[in-house]
């Protein structure tokens, strides 16, 4: 009886290893579906603006270009100050223009805009307003299957 249990366990383990290897091979040969490549970047820390914009550039390149991934950047809180056109540095302006050309959607929190007394026209080009708030938009995007990233 003991030998039979050992044999059964060995066969079960072999089957599990084979199945896992088979799934892994399929995952490497099949391209990801469009639905699997939706990401929302949450940015509220002023000191992380350049880092987050660099992450988005790297994400686009690593995914194989803007046609392979849908990215939405949602900015609120102190980080929004970096995107005021009058105060944005040249590096920020260049990176924002680049990701906007790559079809990255950018939304500014309407609550933060009111708090900072800034209008959409005063932000760098490419932004829309999250009228009900940045965190509300983030939650809605997550409900739509977006992966949440906060650099």
Regions of interest found by a model, annotated:
Residues 5-25:
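N-terminal export signals
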Residues 20-41, 48:
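C-terminal segment of N-terminal export signals and the immediately downstream linker at the start
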Residues 36, 66-68, 101:
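Extracytoplasmic
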Residues 40-42, 72-74, 105-108:
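Structural recognition of the beta-strand scaffold that forms the well-ordered cores
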Residues 42-53, 83, 87:
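Short, glycine-rich nucleotide/cofactor-binding loops
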Residues 52-65:
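Histidine-anchored nucleotide/phosphate-binding helix
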Residues 70-82:
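Acidic helix-start/capping segments at beta-turn-to-alpha-helix junctions
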Residues 86-151:
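A cross-taxonomic marker for long C-terminal extensions/tails that follow the last structured domain
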């Amino acid at each position: 009886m003991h030998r039979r249990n050992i044999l059964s366990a060995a066969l079960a383990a072999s089957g599990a290893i084979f199945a896992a290897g088979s799934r892994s091979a399929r995952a490497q040969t099949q391209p990801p579906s469009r639905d699997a490549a939706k990401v929302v970047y949450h940015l509220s820390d002023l000191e992380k603006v350049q880092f987050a914009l660099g992450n988005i550039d790297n994400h686009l390149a690593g995914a194989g270009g803007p046609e392979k991934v849908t990215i939405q950047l949602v900015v609120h809180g102190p980080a929004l100050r970096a995107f005021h056109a009058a105060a944005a540095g040249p590096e920020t302006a260049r990176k924002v223009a680049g990701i906007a050309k790559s079809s990255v959607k950018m939304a500014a929190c309407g609550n933060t805009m009111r708090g900072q007394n800034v209008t959409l026209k005063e932000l760098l080009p490419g932004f829309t307003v999250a009228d009900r708030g940045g965190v509300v938009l983030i939650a809605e995007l997550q409900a739509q299957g977006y992966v949440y990233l906060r650099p």
